[in-house]
Amino acid sequence: MRTSFTRLHLSDNYTTVIEKYYRKGEHNFLIFDSMGNISGSIPELFIKDTIKNNTQDKSVNQMMSQKLANVSPDDLLMEVIELMRNEGVAIVSVSENDQLVGVLDRNNIESYLRLKAE
């Protein structure tokens, strides 16, 4: 789980997403509304498509996925992987006592599994 992650907002321009993608090394992002609630996500696939098609002039609100999933820090990794696959999400929020404590994304999980296999 990553406890340090970028919070993008509905009104952000997609160029902001691309900048964070390249500078921060994050691949998938959660999107928040003005009240701090999670509104959606932007998976790496969307970012790559936007770069390829040169459609960065849109807002995050126009380009995000509304598919969301939430897990607990106590959930088993295999359960999280199955949930992500079933729900079609690349990033999940991790909450404890109704508080967002981090995120897990496909890239984090794949890196962890590769390291564990070595």
Which functions belong to the PLM regions below?
Residues S34, T55-Q56, M63, E96:
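Short, functionally important structural connectors and interaction interfaces within domains
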Residues M1-F5, T15, P43, Q56-L68:
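Bateman (tandem CBS) regulatory domains
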